[in-house]
Amino acid sequence: MSNIVIAFPKKETVQNIKKILSQSGYSVQAVCTTGAQALASANNLENGILISGSRFIDMMYMEIHDYLPPEFQMLLIASPASIQEREVENLVCLALPMKVHELLQTLEMMEGEIHRRRKKM
């Protein structure tokens, strides 16, 4: 399983997503409330998935995506308006309100992509 980092500005959002993932068998490596924390956590891991909101007190999701290690994929969970205005390639998005099964299926798809990439190396 991939390393998972969860980053949202509200701690309760982070905890709710962590609970959903833990109950579904995923291991969450770090929970963060700022972009800087998310990047530091990702840089300490070899690879994985960053599940992120769109706005933090210190940066926007585009900046986080730009500085994210290449071995990491990013899953943006945001309002439909935020997702429509995005101009970032290689970014997986889920619109709010989000259903639990959508999150789990998306993570499964992203993990499959990471696994395929590792096999090619």
Where are these regions (language model features)?
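Conserved acidic carboxylate
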Residues: 7-8
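Two-component/phosphorelay signaling modules centered on CheY-like receiver
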Residues: 11-30
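Conserved phosphotransfer microenvironments
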Residues: 14, 35-38, 48-69, 79-82
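Active-site charged/polar residues at nucleotide-handling catalytic sites that mediate phosphoryl
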Residues: 44-45
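Alpha4 helix (beta4-alpha4-beta5 surface) of REC/receiver domains from two-component response regulators
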Residues: 63, 78-95, 105
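The C-terminal output helix
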Residues: 108-121
